[in-house]
């Protein structure tokens, strides 16, 4: 891609009646980058020029601060051998949060040489999403070992440090041999899915709390960067629990999984004209 193609694409969007574009630039900016958190400068320049052309054509932006499973890091998130999962580890690893901050801040607070503005302060930026499809993070299979400490803290607060109350509530779901909070193991995803016992309820309440807290964290960071518009997250899940996680969002964004491009984002790719019902 180059400036000419970026300008032509922006003009084509306007010609076809679009007035807003959603963009998730992390993978593209890290392609060919030299180190974690350091963008490919040619691609960053092209992104800023693209924003300029979109603005010229009256097109607003909805921005995904992060979408890749490895964020603003070197590597290929689509590689099946890639074991990093930032959508999960962002809840427990400060290094992942720092990676999110470094990349997001560069995009939003760097003065665009073509528009002369910081995107965070430009009315062109209409909406922001903290992390695309973050629901995948706390729905991954397996045991959530890294969250065990926060899980125990949550249970201590809920049951007011009275292990007897937890034991009575969990009944036969209390792991064998466990006699106090600090001996509780990490929970497994399957223990909280499609179950109605109190331990399952506690697991889901805990996950909802983590997701709500993450939304608050995203909002604080965006505000600190100078963005004053609507912030949201959890734009994929459609369960009742997901609705609770979005309760304090400024708006609801919801992905619809139909009419995918025939050849991903490559030139000549086509989109079906069928409806979501038709597909």
Where are these regions (language model features)?
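Active-site mouth of glycoside hydrolases
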Residues: 1-220, 224-230, 234-249, 261
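Carboxylate/His-rich catalytic cores and anion/metal-binding grooves
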Residues: 232, 243-278
């Amino acid at each position: 891609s180059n400036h000419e193609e970026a300008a032509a694409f922006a003009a084509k969007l306007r010609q076809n009646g679009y007035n807003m574009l959603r963009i998730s630039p992390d993978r593209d900016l890290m392609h060919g980058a030299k180190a974690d958190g350091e963008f490919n400068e040619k691609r960053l320049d092209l992104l800023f020029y693209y924003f300029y052309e979109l603005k010229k054509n009256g097109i607003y932006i909805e921005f995904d601060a992060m979408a890749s499973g490895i964020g603003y890091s070197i590597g290929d998130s689509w590689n099946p051998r890639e074991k990093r999962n930032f959508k999960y580890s962002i809840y427990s690893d400060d290094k992942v949060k720092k990676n999110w901050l470094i990349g997001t801040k560069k995009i939003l607070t760097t003065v665009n040489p073509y528009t002369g503005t910081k995107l965070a302060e430009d009315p062109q930026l209409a909406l922001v999403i903290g992390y695309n499809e973050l629901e995948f993070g706390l729905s991954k299979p397996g045991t959530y070992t890294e969250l065990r400490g926060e899980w125990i803290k949550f249970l201590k607060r809920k049951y007011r440090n009275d292990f007897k109350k937890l034991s009575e509530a969990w009944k036969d779901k209390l792991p064998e041999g466990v006699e106090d909070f600090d001996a509780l193991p990490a929970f497994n995803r399957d223990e909280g899915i499609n179950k109605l016992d109190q331990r399952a309820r506690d697991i889901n309440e805990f996950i909802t709390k983590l997701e709500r807290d993450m939304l608050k964290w995203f909002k604080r960071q965006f505000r600190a960067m100078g963005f004053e518009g609507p912030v949201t997250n959890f734009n994929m899940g459609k369960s009742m629990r997901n609705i609770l996680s979005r309760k304090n969002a400024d708006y609801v964004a919801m992905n619809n999984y139909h009419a995918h491009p025939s050849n991903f984002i490559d030139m000549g790719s086509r989109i079906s004209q069928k409806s979501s019902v038709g597909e």
